[in-house]
């Protein structure tokens, strides 16, 4: 296993099975963030993640964290909160604001650079990247974004500026996604937060098999049309 240097003139990727074991899943570096290359990466179970000032790094970890939307774990406290939620949840209303919210400075810094923002804005304009917004009246208080692959959604990042805002984004999206035929969410790497919401780990091989199948399937034609997914009870 060795780290592969990508060409700027060829969007092909090496097999994810050749990724390093340490750091887990690092597959290649270089290339660019063009829409064609990003889409090729997602189709092969690969995603970019790198720190400001570093070269573009491409990953395909083993194991892979996934969440079946129908298996979202709703805690008692979250169930009580959501029953009286003050939030309105929308789809594809404010992609730029959501990715900017995810990129806002945090204690640990951010990997969402201006280049990443511009790259995913292009994917959104092309109809591949999507956002879920959580509003308190007309103020954006949370959200998430990711890339669609048929009936699989590759979650990239989320943010929260109010109590349970990001959980609300994920909960409402999972409910709608599952209801309309969505099968799987890619969470990339398991952490305490996603595990508490029902995410589990599967092998990379299993994930790639699921990806190959699910990206060929289709959601209803109008699924990604900007719309309201949830309104607070009056």
Swiss-Prot record:
Q: Which GO terms describe its biological process?
A: protein catabolic process
Q: Name one GO molecular function term.
A: leucyl-tRNA--protein transferase activity
Keyword Cytoplasm appears in the UniProt entry:
yes
> Could you tell me the keywords of this UniProt record?
Acyltransferase, Cytoplasm, Transferase
Q: Quote a single Gene Ontology cellular component term.
A: cytoplasm
Tell me which domain of life the UniProt entry assigns to the organism this sequence originates from: Bacteria
Question: Where does it live in the cell?
Answer: Cytoplasm
**EC number(s)?**
2.3.2.6
Q: Which NCBIfam families match?
A: aat (TIGR00667)
Query: Tell me, what does this protein do in biology?
Result: Functions in the N-end rule pathway of protein degradation where it conjugates Leu, Phe and, less efficiently, Met from aminoacyl-tRNAs to the N-termini of proteins containing an N-terminal arginine or lysine.
The cross-references to HAMAP family, in alphabetical order and at most eight, read: Leu_Phe_trans
Give the family per the record: Belongs to the L/F-transferase family.
Name this polypeptide is given: Leucyl/phenylalanyl-tRNA--protein transferase
Q: Which organism is it from?
A: Enterobacter sp. (strain 638)
């Amino acid at each position: 296993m060795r780290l592969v240097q990508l060409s700027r003139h060829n969007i092909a990727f090496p097999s994810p099975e050749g990724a390093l074991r340490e750091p887990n899943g690092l597959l290649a570096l270089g290339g660019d963030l063009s829409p064609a290359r990003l889409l090729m990466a997602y189709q092969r179970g690969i995603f970019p993640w790198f720190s400001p000032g570093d070269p573009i790094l491409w990953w395909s970890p083993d194991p892979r964290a996934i969440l079946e939307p129908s298996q979202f774990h709703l805690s008692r406290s979250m169930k009580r909160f959501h029953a009286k939620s003050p939030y309105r949840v929308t789809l594809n209303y404010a992609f730029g604001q959501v990715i900017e919210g995810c990129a806002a400075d945090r204690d640990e810094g951010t990997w969402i650079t201006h280049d990443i923002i511009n790259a995913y804005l292009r994917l959104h304009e092309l109809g591949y990247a999507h956002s879920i917004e959580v509003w308190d009246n007309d103020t954006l208080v949370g959200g998430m974004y990711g890339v669609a692959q048929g009936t699989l959604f590759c979650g990239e990042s989320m943010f929260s500026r109010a109590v349970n805002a990001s959980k609300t984004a994920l909960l409402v999206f999972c409910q709608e996604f599952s209801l309309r035929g969505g099968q799987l969410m890619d969470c990339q790497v398991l952490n305490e937060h996603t595990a508490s919401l029902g995410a589990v780990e599967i092998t990379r091989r299993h994930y790639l098999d699921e990806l190959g199948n699910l990206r060929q399937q289709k959601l209803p034609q109008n699924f990604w049309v900007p719309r309201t997914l949830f309104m607070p009870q009056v």
